[in-house]
Every structure is written in structure tokens, then in C-alpha cells.
Amino acid sequence: NQKNENTIQVGIMGIDVASEGPLSKKHKASYIFNYRYSTTGLLNLEGGTMDYQDLNLKLNFPTQKAGTFSVWGTSLIDKFTSDFEKNTEKWDYWGDRSESRDKQYMAAGGVSHRYFFNNDASLKTTIAATYSQLDGGATLFNHSMESTPYMDLDSKYTNLIFTTTFNRKFSNRFTNKTGFTYTNMFYKMDLSIAPYEAEPLEIVSQGKGNTSLISAYNSSSVGLTER
């Protein structure tokens, strides 16, 4: 939180851009940022095309009396498209005349707060959300280059999370940690597969819903010697 640092790295497999530094030197607020892109998305690789990138960000806001607040987020995009042999005379295997695609999206973000008490104790609370999506499919070609789909997948998952942890150091040898987590989970799934070649897709799994999960824990650590 004292000075800005910026970094750009270029390698065989990707590009990495990072930056960190103060948002406000007076209030000691700071940020950290990182972005990566895989150069495989720019290359014509045998067998398919891959494209990957991710982004990470965290903002830190310490206060004099109310503890430290932080806002964070992370996300990624991962894509793959396979190549198929367009020359039918070179078809030797079933995979030579099939083309598949996969797209994966993931994101998470939240707000955290940490407060330190005067008795060697701290309380950390986080409210967060996560999201993931997988979109995939596969297509089969015949010798006339007519295509028919034989698999289609679309799944989405969303989690809303609230978690808090109380940590207390009673002595150099004894520490106790207590906390709980509440998660509300949402899902949507659509999966269809063709039972045989050139036949229409049939639904294998389809549905959506949500459920909740509560978990609590208490743990203690005892040291055999003074730290």
C-alpha cells in the first residue's frame, strides 16, 4: 500500500499483466490486479483451438476503528473447439468425422470484513457469490458432409454464500476457532444425447432447482512447546 508496481510478462504459453499499489496513501487502501491470456488461442494447433483467460482483482480498505474491508473477484473463460478431418478419404476412425466444442465460464466475487479485538481475537465475515457454466456439444459428419448433433450440454450453477469465523488466541499454546457457513445453491441442467448415429437427440437429464446447506465447526490447537 506504499507504491505502485506494474508487471507485464510475455512467454511462449501466455501473456500476464499484473498491477498493485495504493488507492489512497492517506487511508492505506490498496489494490491488486492480475490478468492472464493464453497464447494458445492465437495458435493453429493440430487437433483443435484452445482459448483461456482469467482475471483476478482485490481491493483492500483498512479503517482505524471498524476493521478492514475488502472487495474481491475472480473469473475465467476456457474454450476449446476440436478440428475434424474434412477429407473423407482420410477417415479411419469415428473421431475423424466428429467435431466438438466446450465453453466453460466461472466467476466469483464477494465482500469480506475482518475485525481485531483487544483480547487477541478476530472476527472475519464474508458474503460471496459464485457462478459456473458449461456449454458443450458434439456433431457428427457423414461422407456427404452433412452434420447431425449427437450431444448437447448446458449446465449452470450458482452459489450464494455467507460465512463467519471467530478466532481467539488464549495463549501461546492454545488457539480456538469457531465458525459457520450458509450456502444457497441453484442449478440448471440440460443434457441430450443421440442414441444412435443420425437420430434425433433425446433428453438424458433436464431440471433445475435449489437447496441450502448449513455447516458449523469448532476446532482448537494446542502447542506442546512455547511459540
Residue ranges, per PLM feature:
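Flexible, solvent-exposed coil segments and beta strand-coil junctions
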Residues: N1, N34-L43, M50, D83-G95, ...
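Predominantly transmembrane beta-strands of Gram-negative outer membrane beta-barrel pores used
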Residues: N1-T49, D54-P62, S70-T74
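Short, solvent-exposed beta-strand edge segments and adjacent coil->beta transition regions
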Residues: K3-E5, D54, D96, A108, ...
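A short, polar/proline- and glycine-enriched secondary-structure boundary/capping micro-motif
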Residues: A18-E20, T81-S82, D135
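Glycine-rich, flexible loop segments associated with nucleotide phosphate handling
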Residues: K28-I32, G95-S98, Y150-D152
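Face-selective signature of the C-terminal outer-membrane beta-barrel domain
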Residues: N60-D78, S100-R227
